[in-house]
């Protein structure tokens, strides 16, 4: 089923996602989408307040909550998956954001946030995306030393690729970096780790939804 705004609206009503329904559901969905697309919380609030009074805090809540009714990746046979990770700053510390993209469908199968970048992180992340695979796909990686041992441990075939087929995961991170550039690629000092995880998970779910519409 194509995930239209009407379908998302029905899911929100069915799940009783929001305790209060004083604002129209369509405006809540649009608020989350506009924030994902790059507008700040305040700009989304100012724009949508022409239709209904919405605070920037409400926009933040909608962005984090709507992911709960967006489609998770389907479990199916997958041939090639490209994985990679980047550094993001939270306050004065760095974290790693990992992503896995199906090379053929360009769908993001999962994101993972860690404070370290090692074999254990690789195993935990790859295990989390294998639930969307009915087979053992081939994994495309860069030269990161934390990949080979972990992937062999999981019994997965892998190949080191710098460009070409791995461009899809680079494209995902390009979109993510453009979005985080709005706050200088740095989450605020008071951002909790769980909040950052939720923010990036929401980003992934909106990313897949928007891609499914094109």
Swiss-Prot record:
Transmembrane segments: none annotated. InterPro entries: DDE_dom, RNaseH-like_sf, Transpos_IS6. It holds the Pfam family DDE_Tnp_IS240. This is Uncharacterized protein MJ0017. It comes from Methanocaldococcus jannaschii (strain ATCC 43067 / DSM 2661 / JAL-1 / JCM 10045 / NBRC 100440) (Methanococcus jannaschii).
């Amino acid at each position: 089923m194509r995930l239209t705004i009407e379908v998302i609206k029905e899911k929100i009503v069915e799940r009783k996602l929001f305790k209060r329904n004083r604002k129209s559901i369509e405006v809540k969905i649009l608020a989350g989408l506009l924030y994902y697309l790059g507008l700040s919380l305040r700009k989304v609030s100012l724009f949508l307040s022409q239709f209904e009074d919405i605070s920037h805090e409400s926009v933040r809540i909608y962005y984090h909550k709507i992911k709960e009714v967006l489609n998770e990746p389907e479990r199916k046979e997958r041939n090639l998956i490209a994985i990679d990770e980047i550094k993001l700053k939270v306050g004065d510390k760095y974290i790693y954001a990992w992503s896995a993209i199906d090379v053929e469908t360009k769908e993001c199968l999962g994101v993972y946030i860690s404070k370290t970048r090692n074999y254990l992180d690789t195993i935990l992340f790859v295990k989390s995306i294998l639930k969307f695979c009915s087979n053992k796909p081939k994994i495309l990686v860069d030269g990161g030393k934390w990949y080979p041992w972990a992937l062999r441990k999981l019994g997965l075939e892998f190949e080191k690729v710098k460009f070409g087929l791995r461009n899809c995961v680079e494209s995902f991170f390009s979109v993510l970096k453009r979005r985080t550039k709005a706050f200088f690629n740095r989450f605020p000092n008071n951002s909790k780790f769980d909040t950052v995880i939720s923010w990036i998970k929401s980003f992934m779910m909106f990313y897949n939804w928007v891609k499914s519409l094109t």
